[in-house]
Amino acid sequence: MMGIQERKKREKERRRQQIMIAAKRVFSTKGFNKATMEDIAKEAELSPGTLYLYFKNKDELFSSLSIRILQYLNIRLGHVADNRKRLTVDQKIEALREAMHDVYKFDPLMLINMFHLQSSETLKNLSSDLIADIKKLSRNSLTIIARLFDEEIHNGAVIDKPAMVLADIIWSMFSGIVLWEESKKMIEGDKDFLEKTLDTAFDIFRRGIKTKLLKKTL
């Protein structure tokens, strides 16, 4: 009996992954607004009805793809946190910049979509479980970043401001630059200044949050 149940579970997960792979292709070529569940079903070689057994609507399918980028972000930030004891303030901020740029390179489209998702009405159309997952992953990312700053605030290396506020600023800076650089491509073609802009932004942030004592070493 357990063997049958296990096979059914694996088959369900395989079908779910099949749908998500097809959805990513369709969203990449048509964009979210023009893509339909019928387009995705055709790409996955499944009936539209089958898709609705796994995802209640297009918004939920789109958001499920975006969760993957949040999961990867959590993993990369976790790597920074694991090494925090042997990193200086400068090295921590540089490690954060590298982690975030790495997440962008991992899947630019899904990262951009995720940032749009978090600032849109789409969240209202998602299941409570999916919303909970998105909130949990986002909160975990911010908590990891805040803890990195909290340690430096306590030892006097960073200005005495709430660590979560500094984490929010880092997150806002990252998402804002990604979205702005993407919009600039519509005007300036395929020129990509994201890495250079991100470098400059993190450098300004780093200089701004360090205490006067440490600034003398700049």
Kindly give the residue locations of the regions a language model identified.
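Hydrophobic alpha-helical connector segments
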Residues: 64, 68, 79-109, 166-170, ...
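Short coil/turn segments at alpha/beta junctions that flank glycine-rich nucleotide-binding fingerprints
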Residues: 29-33, 107, 155-156
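Membrane-interface starts of transmembrane alpha-helices
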Residues: 159, 163-167
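Short secondary-structure transition hinges
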Residues: 105-143
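Generic hydrophobic, amphipathic alpha-helix propensity
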Residues: 15-24, 40, 65-77, 145
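C-terminal peripheral helix-coil segments that are non-catalytic and often amphipathic
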Residues: 1-3, 99-102, 139, 143, ...
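Helix-turn-helix
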Residues: 18, 22, 26-64
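Amphipathic, non-transmembrane alpha-helical scaffold segments
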Residues: 12, 20, 62, 66, ...
